[in-house]
Amino acid sequence: MDNLVFVKIGSGIGAGLILGGHPFSGSLGITGEIGHETITDNGVACHCGNRGCLETVASTSVMMALLGTRAPVSTADIVRNALSGDSATLRVLDDAGAAIGRGLASIANLINPEVIVIGGPLAGLDQILLDPIRRGLLRHAVPSVGEATGLVMSSLGDRAEALGAASLVLQSPGLRRA
């Protein structure tokens, strides 16, 4: 695939871009800060200084805070509770997924990737998380773009970032191989 986006949903939300078959890092090397895309104009203040950033409504930290009002909740608890059908957990995931899909619609409209891969500690949720993301993507993307954009869950789990970084090092033209 020549054009894809990898999105990690964790305590932050970030994206890695492959455009034209090559990693894209932008002029400052900080491309992919999708977590700081404004989703709600009058939303909660974000640590970056803006308001209504995607991370303020859809990061795992926010999910844990919403679900942990009686006792602390981990990402493993979120996965386990969602898979067992807990209605509060499913609602939080549905809301977060819809917001993530809205953010991904902007990326899809802008670069028209062949596929968007979702990863991070919630990757085990598969369709439970992909379905609301897909709904948000389809609702906010140009119809033909939304329909043509593949959306899949990473099979690499929390290893995706490390494997991606290792791949970049191995592809580096200045790397001396022993």
What are these regions (language model features)?
Residues 1-57:
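Glycine-rich phosphate-binding loop of actin/hexokinase-like ATP-binding domains
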Residues 42-45, 50-178:
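ATP-binding/phosphotransfer module of carbohydrate and carboxylate kinases, centering on a glycine-rich
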